[in-house]
Amino acid sequence: IVRMATPSIYGDEQQIVSSDVVRDLEALAEDKNVKAVVLRINSGGGDAYASEQIWHAVSELNKKKPVVVSMGGMAASGAYYMSMGARYVMAQPTTLTGSIGIFGALPDFSDLLTKKLGFKYDEVKTNKNSAYMGAGTARPWSQEEITHLQAYVNRGYALFRKRVADGRKMNVRKLKKSLREESGSERMPRRSN
């Protein structure tokens, strides 16, 4: 699940591009000949923001027409996230699903670029937070930058849990107790709207 199509290191791997999916879901919502929508999802997840965009489009479509998610071999992380906007979610007994979590990777190439390759950097900025994109390349990440990014990840994780709890018709506290990766036969059944 990505925001925009990019070349994959895995070759011709298919990508779920949020802008394309959102456009298609909006078209289905307006199509008078479509009475219900079945989304077949088979993905290990991806970008949290892209998953939120698709979740929103699924939720909006579900207000107009019933949306059913049919999970394939895997519907984990972002794929599970976007499924929670549907009226019904069905998984095969062997579907790997769940994996409710968000992470952010902070690469640090500063030693490679500055010490090994000899790059030199000067930093000119308008305020102390305007150089985030320079962190990890020109210099290591500061603790303050890591703390800000951790807060961003925590907010995304809280939103993810809320989307799942709302979609599963349960409170977040109960959901927290059951957070783990499961197969389709282990996952609690969804209740309909």
Predicted segments, located by residue:
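Small-residue-centered hinge/linker elements
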Residues: 1-65, 74-80, 84-167
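Glycine-rich beta-to-alpha transition loops that act as phosphate-gripper elements at the mouths
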Residues: 70-76, 129, 178-182
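Amphipathic alpha-helical substructures
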Residues: 167-193
